[in-house]
Swiss-Prot record:
It is found in: Mitochondrion inner membrane. It is a peripheral membrane protein. This is Protein ABC transporter 1, mitochondrial. Its EC number is 2.7.-.-. Pathway: Cofactor biosynthesis; ubiquinone biosynthesis. Belongs to the protein kinase superfamily. ADCK protein kinase family. GO terms for cellular component: mitochondrial inner membrane; mitochondrion. It comes from Arabidopsis thaliana. Residues 295-583 form the Protein kinase domain. It comes from the Eukaryota.
Length: 623
């Protein structure tokens, strides 16, 4: 059997498993199994028809073309005393997208029409916009990336075009049956795409990549990768969250063409329409929720995996950001992630050494917490207290009156995402890079409580006040004292190039079993030394001229091949945040006194037990 037919067979098997999930989760189909055909017809006929036209992709692998028009409904509504949401004064509408796709079925070339090429000129840095709102105005929300902005060497330098998704307003599949159908359609679309790609290759031969390497399997062609990304953007919820996690992986884990396609999922989800938004507001805040506000903007500032953010003004005049959760996502975490796992397994996208099952387990736990906005509100208040005396950081106020388990309202604050700071002068970039690393070390080794989502939009820099505004604490978590003790010792061993110390602490932490081959141990130690480089020498470490990411990438394949066990659960979130801090410094091209910052923490740290420490040193850092 040829390789393409084997791949196709694997995906067909995966689609059948998803179809089984539809059956297991659908109460209507359970009625049919019990012989209640009349109940099946009356309760689910119309629902199934509507759901089938509101989901990701088609079984033919083609997309419905969306027609964009200007909505007749206003974007911003104002509430007077005693008014309800149907009695409002409207401002001119900003933008809206037709909530219903046209029935025209278009060729797969239309896949390209879901995206646009934008050219960002670096001398127009004040014009970065997110959903029609200037990025500098956004505070308390996760900004949707407006394209990669690189450092400008001159005012006339033009950044290469960046491929971006065109925003769409579409209902969130919110019932178990609708979400299961969505995954079924997505899997079928991938299968059809694989058939077309395989047919093309049988006739024309396997295409080659720009570096003269054979292209990916027909199952994971560029077009199929884009289908996967678009499907996840429409499903939202845990499905999109997993896609976003994959999008920030290294090329040693996920092939570059797939990463390029998954970049679309980082640009934001499809937008939830007003018809779904109002019922959530009614259910969470009461049918008179508008009495608590002066105005509410239905045009979202941002749309993410679990919810979307809207600007509003409270009765006391405070501008706020209201994060509103998509309906159904909290109850579909388990099934969503299992369906994504099936698709990933049957597309062979994830290498064996990644220990997908363990990663999925951790993802389920993290997502369950992120879907509870009451937990996030507590975490945000805790961070606000912890950082209240730390210069250079600000955590916005939580507004309890308009917050609930599925709605989080916080003070709206201004700033630009950290990656856009790359457009500013070197002194500012060095300052921001230093503050980012200072925060990361303090979170882990002082607070033992860390916000683990490294999304650059979660850190908004206010140049006027030289303050980094911190938002989105859904992924905040505590770390056990013993784990932090040993992790600090391991970091110091890496900085001191102490091979025995790295191996010993890695075994104590659970990164190694003690039965690894010499090849694996050597790769693990060398990777640790590379990560420890910024902390190895006094003075400033120039992240611009030292590419840590590419150096580790060269060792990634070896470690994946020879790894015997998954890392400890704490490592998934921790390393996501640590790598994010390093990548931010690389993006900024910052020079940071990393060793001094580490020693400042290390020399004040109180270990619960005192084995031989890798180093005893003094700090030369200035306050």
């Amino acid at each position: 059997m040829s390789s393409w037919s084997k791949s196709f067979t694997r995906l067909v098997n995966g689609v059948s498993l998803v179809a089984k999930e539809i059956y297991n989760q659908s109460p209507e189909l359970q009625r049919a199994r019990n012989g209640d055909l009349e109940g099946l017809i009356t309760s689910s006929g119309k629902k199934a028809l509507v759901a089938a036209t509101d989901l990701v992709g088609l079984t033919s692998g083609k997309l419905r073309e969306l027609s964009i028009r200007r909505s007749k409904e206003p974007s911003v509504v104002y509430f007077d005393e005693g008014d309800n949401k149907d009695n409002v004064v409207a401002t001119p509408e900003v933008r809206s997208v037709n909530t219903k796709p046209s029935e025209k079925i278009v060729d797969s070339k239309v896949l390209r029409n879901e995206f646009s090429d934008e050219v960002k000129n670096s001398n127009r840095e004040g014009e970065i916009k997110v959903s029609g709102v200037e990025a500098g105005e956004i505070i308390g929300v996760r900004a949707v990336e407006s394209g990669t902005v690189t450092e400008a060497s001159s005012p006339s330098e033009v950044v290469p075009p960046v491929k971006r998704r065109r925003p769409r307003e579409r209902k969130v599949p919110s019932t178990p049956m609708a979400r299961a159908y969505g995954f079924f359609n997505l899997g079928a679309a991938l299968a059809w795409g694989a058939v077309k790609e395989s047919t093309y290759r049988m006739v024309n031969g396997t295409p080659m990549t720009p570096d003269n390497q054979p292209a990916l399997s027909s199952l994971m062609s560029k077009e199929n990768a884009e289908r996967l990304a678009l499907g996840l953007c429409e499903m939202r919820g845990a499905a999109l969250k997993v896609g976003q996690m994959l999008s920030i992986q290294d090329e040693s884990l996920v092939p570059a063409p797939i990463l390029n396609a998954l970049e679309y999922v980082r640009q934001g989800a499809d937008v939830m329409p007003r018809s779904q938004l109002n019922p959530v507001l009614d259910a969470e805040l009461g049918s008179n929720w508008q009495s608590k506000l002066t105005s509410f903007d239905y045009e979202p500032l941002a749309a993410a995996s679990i919810g979307q953010v809207h600007r509003a003004v409270t009765k006391d005049g405070l501008e706020v950001a209201m994060k509103i959760q998509y309906p159904g996502v909290a109850n579909s975490i388990e099934s969503d992630i299992e369906n994504v796992r099936r698709l990933l397994n049957y597309t062979n996208l994830i290498p064996k050494g990644l220990f997908l099952d363990r990663a999925i387990k951790v993802a389920k736990e993290e997502l369950a917490q992120e879907c509870d906005y009451e937990i996030e509100a507590v975490s945000q208040k805790r961070f606000r207290d912890l950082l209240s005396d730390t210069p250079g950081f600000y955590v916005p106020l939580v507004v309890d009156e308009t917050s609930s388990k599925k709605i989080l309202t916080t003070e709206l604050i201004s700033g630009i995402p950290i990656d856009k700071v790359a457009l500013l002068d070197q002194k500012t970039r060095d300052y921001v890079g230093r503050k980012m690393l200072e925060l990361t070390l303090k979170e882990l080794f002082v607070f033992r409580f860390m916000q683990t989502d490294p999304n650059w939009g979660n850190f908004l820099y206010n140049e006027a006040t030289k303050t980094i505004n911190l938002i989105d604490f859904g992924a905040a978590r505590d770390y056990p004292k013993k784990f932090v003790d040993d992790y600090l010792r391991m970091v110091m061993a890496c900085a001191e190039k102490d091979s025995e110390g790295v191996i010993e602490m890695s075994r104590r932490l659970g990164f190694l079993t003690g039965d690894e081959s010499d090849v694996m141990l050597d790769a693990h130690v060398q990777a640790g030394f590379i990560v420890g480089l910024p902390f190895a020498e006094p003075g400033g470490y120039a992240f611009r001229t030292n590419n840590i990411a590419s150096s580790i990438s060269n060792l990634g394949a070896t470690m994946l091949k020879h790894r015997l066990s998954p890392p400890p659960d704490e490592a998934y979130s921790l390393h996501r945040k640590l790598s994010g801090a390093f990548l931010a410094c690389i993006k900024l091209g910052a020079t940071v006194p990393c060793r001094d910052l580490l020693l400042q923490v290390y020399n004040k740290y109180q270990f619960d037990d005192e084995p031989q420490d890798p180093v005893v040193a003094t700090s030369s850092v200035s306050s």
